[in-house]
A protein has these predicted regions:
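Peripheral, non-transmembrane regulatory/ligand-interaction domains of membrane transport proteins
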Residues: 1-244
């Protein structure tokens, strides 16, 4: 069967990483498809982070979703291309929708839904494209002190959400620098390009706030919720995330 270019492109952008760790060790498994992983052989005594990057079909995700007994709403949720930050608790886990934001090549805001599914010892993250967004967190686990790897999956979720919020703040700083450049140009000699630049920045900032405020609301509700999947010793870290937004 001959694949079209779009199918080949999607396959090239698919990736599965499984990070398993405990206080003194860490192991990373790489795969291009969930069917390549023998899920039953995962050590359930270790904290496990499954990173799903790229676009997979429901059939391709079946080995993963079946092993972790995903609720149908979770399967439906991870295929959303646009999603408002939210969380929902199920019997077996906590499902969280968030957004990764960046500026594209044209300077417009690009927001990509990021989904998390948290169980007692497992965190699964879904990012709709293959990129190195979470690589700094993987590096932190590799190089971090044993105390960091001693923490469980609920703390790992905190690290990832906090990293996303830090990324928001860096983007705000970048937008601020762009605004200063535009303002300096206007002070010297305003022209039609400066007016267009201001209008574009207003558009970008408006879209940015449309992403950030729902994220802030979600984290606030998340902090107030008494979830069984977030331990008491970790809850204050989530409060810190909310205070940064």
């Amino acid at each position: 069967m001959i694949q079209n270019r779009e199918e080949k492109r999607m396959e090239q952008n698919q990736n599965i990483q499984i990070v398993q760790y405990k206080e003194q060790s860490i192991e990373i498994i790489q795969a291009s498809n969930p069917s390549e992983v023998d899920w039953k052989k995962l050590d359930t005594k270790l904290t496990t982070w499954v990173i799903v990057s790229g676009f997979f079909s429901e059939a391709e995700l079946a080995p993963l979703s079946n092993y972790f007994s995903f609720h149908p709403l979770i399967i439906e949720g991870v295929f959303q291309k646009k999603a408002r930050p939210a969380f929902e608790e199920f019997d077996d886990g906590l499902f969280i929708t968030s957004n990764c934001v960046n500026l594209d090549e044209e300077g417009d805001l690009a927001d990509i839904p990021v989904f998390f599914y948290l169980t007692d010892h497992v965190l699964i993250s879904f990012l709709g494209q293959q990129c190195a967004f979470f690589e700094p967190i993987i590096a932190k686990l590799k190089n971090g002190k044993p105390r960091l790897k001693k923490m469980k999956a609920d703390y790992l979720l905190n690290l990832l959400l906090d990293y996303q919020v830090d990324h928001y703040l860096l983007l705000i700083e970048s937008l601020g620098e762009k605004i200063e450049i535009i303002q300096d140009g206007i002070l010297e000699e305003a022209d039609s390009k400066d007016i267009q630049a201001i209008q574009h920045m207003r558009y970008v900032l408006y879209n940015f706030l449309r992403v950030v405020w729902p994220m802030r609301e979600m984290i606030n509700l998340f902090v107030m919720d008494d979830s069984d999947f977030i331990s008491d010793g970790v809850k204050h870290f989530y409060r810190d995330i909310h205070s940064h937004l």
